[in-house]
Amino acid sequence: MIPAKYSPKDIEAEIFKFWDDNRIYEKVKAKEGKKFYFVDGPPYTTGRIHLGTAWNKVIKDTILRYKRMTGFSPTDTPGWDMHGLPIEVKVEQELGFKTKRDIEKYGIAEFVQKCMEYALRNKDAMTEQFKMLGVWMDWENPYMTIKAEYMNAAWWTIRIAYEKGLLERKKMVVNWCPRCETALADAEVEYWDEEDPSIYVKFPVKNEPNTYIVIWTTTPWTLPANMAVAVHPSLEYVKIKALKDDRIEYLILAKELAESVLAKGDYKLWEIVETYLGEDLVGLEYEHPLSDEVPLQKKWRHAVYIADFVTAENTGCVHIAPGHGLEDYELGVKEGLEIFNPVDDRGVYTEEGGKYAGMFVKDANDEIIEDLYRKELLLAEEKIVHRYGHCWRCKSPIIYRSTEQWFLKISKLKTLMLEEIDKVRWVPEWAGSARFKDWVSNAKDWCISRQRYWGIPLPIWICEKCGEMKVVGSINEVPWESDLDLHRPKIDEVVFKCKCGGDMKRVPDVFDVWFDSGVASWGSLAYPLEADEFEKLWPADFITEGHDQTRGWFYSQLGASVICFSKAPYKTVLMHGFTLDEYGRKMSKSLGNVVEPEEVVEQIGVDGFRLYVLTSAPWEDLRFSWDEARNINRMLNIVWNAVRFAYTYMSIDKFKTKGLRSADLKVEDKWILSRLESFNKEAYDAMENYQLHRVVRKFFDFFVEDFSRWYIQLIRPRVWEEKDSPSKLAAYETIFKVIDKAFRIIAPFAPFLSEWIYRHVISEFKDCKESIFLESFPPPREEFIDLELEKNMEIVREIVEAASNARQKARRKLRWPLRKLIIETRDEGVKSAVKKMESIIKMQSNVKSIEIVNEFEKELVLKPNYKVIGPLLKARAKDFVEYVKTLKEVPETINFEGLELKGSEAIIAEYKVPEGYEYAEFSRGIVYIYKELDDELRKEAYAREIIRRIQEMRKEMDLDVEEFIESYVEMDSKLIEGWEEYIKSETRSIKLEFGETTGYTKEWDIEGMKIKIGIKRCSSKSG
């Protein structure tokens, strides 16, 4: 028996146990098939999974299950990203550490061990969460970035880069986190709005009293490192004579910005005294505004230079600090400026910072502004809210500073990388052609070094004596005396002897953690230590991650792969979106809008969760809505009830499938089979194009709308026919075909329900394999698709729905038969469909006859839509009423007293029809019903009402479908005269008596009439 209610928890518990007890995953994985190399983008082992991580793994699991069911043997090794700041910062928080000094005091070895333990502990917890979502992966054999064979792949990659001249150490301005005291890649910087100072500063021009170049900055702390001013060569600049506080000043700035800047400085009177192009200002020298506070500045020349990156914004004169900005740095290198960086790793000024030495740079802003004000060099001071970069892990504001770092020369690879992007299949296409290409086109050399502890150590050793460099490309090159451990500080103890006799010691840096995952497509295969799997599988057939990975994992993989193999490491990339709340906001604890996967599973089950997240187009952001999630569960209940209905009757008749006999199929059977194959074809096409959302949507359209709400209603009378009736058997064969095929299609999406239905329903009526996942995804049988039949049935359903709408207007319930239904249409397709399926329309609309007419007697009545015109026209609405009276039809657009309105919105069109009729429109015509009832119709109506009540009472008594009863009705028997036998057959009553009731009795209100009904179970099921 199938339980009356769909219970996801019970189903999941049973299926989990079945899979585990019978090692179903292992049996499915053991099947031979074509190669399909999937690489799992490794999540950081930083804690519990969130909604987005869950969605990501469900997408992957669905695709892998589909591939297994379509003749492939996909790799399904889960990956774990276990190094880097994501782990370090979490461990620091656990230990209460604030700075790197705390780590070094605690001990690097001890800290690294804590990071290892933390990463492994979270890997285990997250594994259980993924398993809870029904994700089938090789959880016993994951790839982990902390394993020696994986770390070896990173070392080998850097060795290749070194051999190709693509690895270099250089001084460069980089993103820097002063809390973590390390360089960061662009992909590791998160931006959000922050308030900062916005100041306009006057730089005194040398040898020109009271003359100043005006600059603007939001980082006053970089002014101690100022080395130049940049202007645009072709921008027009002016020297302005201005009066302020009885003092004459001469200000140099961009002409088009002068008025707004002077207003900020509260200059009352001013005039332009000179005009020139930016290139004319080149070489103009100025005195550093803080040379007294930063004495080192007195030894350098400060002047104006040209730069194309300058724009006509703020003042048009840009303050240049080559030690604190990338464009500034590049200009400094070009012009031979000092790359001055008086800031240490902690973001604190060094002794070179003069007066500000020992101060954290951000804390120095106010003092620097005060000094400028005191020296009368502060033209204006404001606050600005702008997007500012923050460390992706500790969330501290970053700074820009020049430091010695190790770089991969992406600039030399960019052309090849862009060519390789074009060879990859991107889903959606614009993920590659637009988003990713834009990122790569603007990419700079990749800073791969990090000044941290928990990561893959850079395999670079440098001789202390002669500076000779050695890049180790394999862990086999390292002399080990004990257990192999490539992590710090053990690896730091390894010393090589240089040819010069000196000691070669490892540079202290570790890899950018994005480089770890960047080698995943070969590192996960232990290449190059082991080559067999790599040579069979690489490159990856498929990967999928969120759209943030265009500048993360997609990029790091492409860069590393082009270095090693001169080609992309993946063939197909599916880019998916983010999970947001229903208002489109990022989920965060501070907003209180975080939804955990477990919460959703608790309410709607694992299959409900999977189907809900998979309903959304993968590349769009998923706006989580509890209402929409619960709606999935409501639809699954409809699916369950449809299967339960089928199972109940088919098992009563001990049905066993023998295959479809086309000669016995009725029009509704052929239609649902056509719809099944259309769904099958659409699902197959969608899956081949990674459009998972289309499959889920089409499944519910088909199984809920077509099968449950339509086909089952059409065949209900047939299941009551004799056991061996060809009509009944054809219905059963059709139902079985639908359930069998539909659940094989949806199995990758809803594995628990599909497996349960397969084991408890499908296996009852045919010999089955041990698991639905040992079956094949069904190929579409296009010869069964009859598009004309589908189109005709669509017309019929529209007509039936219109008839239902007309009934509602007439207040006539569907159980009450009507004498006549008239269809007004000139559409030959509608006329043809009605003639072919007249019996279906009659049955579903509960009418005795149908007429088709080209035109029905009616009068068009037009009325203003006051809800629309009232707020718009107000007092003029009366005039609009008069205007409507002049119309014969609804115009497409209305121009009324200068206001343009849509006719269909401003005017309500209704028809006045003959007395006794009601109507409703459909897309190709109008349906009219004759609503008046005669005595014969009333008798049938009351009979149907009695049947419905008895059937409800049978359910309340929990009677089996085949059980017989005795029925007693306390009412005037003349009201249902002639319908007694019909009532008995429909309710399985062996007796129907009128008068005093007995047994289980209830009083009912039927159309205002109080009627008592009593029913009794017969002594045997056969009656």
What positions do the PLM features span?
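Phosphate/diphosphate-binding loops
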Residues: 363-388, 880-884, 1015
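A glycine-biased structural micro-motif
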Residues: 278, 282-283, 355-365
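Catalytic alpha/beta core of large soluble enzyme barrels
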Residues: 225-227, 235-344, 373, 414
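Feature 926 captures the class I aminoacyl-tRNA synthetase adenylation module centered on the KMSKS loop
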Residues: 200, 438, 442-515, 519-521, ...
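Metal-dependent nuclease catalytic cores in nucleic-acid-processing enzymes
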Residues: 58-75, 326-337, 369-372, 550-566, ...
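N-terminal, positively charged nucleic-acid-binding surface of large information/translation enzymes
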Residues: 1-248, 321-334, 338-353, 377-420, ...
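Amphipathic alpha-helical blocks
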Residues: 10-28, 269-283, 886-899
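Amphipathic alpha-helical
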Residues: 16, 158, 162-189, 194, ...
